[in-house]
Amino acid sequence: MIRYCRTTLMVCAAMLAANTFAHGDESAQIRFTTDVVPVLTKLGCNSGGCHGKATGQNGFKLSLLGFEPEFDYQAIVKESRGRRILPGAPEHSLVLVKATNEKPHGGGQRTSIGSEEYEIMRRWIGGGMVAPAADDPVVERITVSPHEKVMENR
């Protein structure tokens, strides 16, 4: 009987862990600098051809490739009287409806509803749009490996 209870408990724990891993931890706080900025970069929003160029695009400017997270946070959350985000209904936020092309977007569709990028943005908005913090991790070094060339020229 004890063995059965222990086995059942282990199976339940494994299923719970697998479910958390597969669906992400919804309670985990999304950080602007380490979670949101990489999404903006991956989708090309802060590239030189889009909102990252010197003049921005259609009244919305981001720092080039996310090098100034505090500037980007202000642009998304505070500029234009906060019209780009709707904390009470994140899925209706302008940054999401433009990125999914639900509302016409000059850059076209950059992501789709339910994608990992979409969910990160939605959870960040719904979670209170936590600002960049002084203790956010920063890149200190990049190492390329291997150090030597491994392919020969022909």
Language-model-detected regions and their locations in the chain:
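Bacterial N-terminal signal peptides that target proteins for export
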Residues: 1-10
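Hydrophobic h-region of N-terminal signal peptides that target proteins for export
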Residues: 13-21
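Aromatic- and Gly/Pro-enriched helix-to-coil junctions and flexible linker segments
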Residues: 21-154
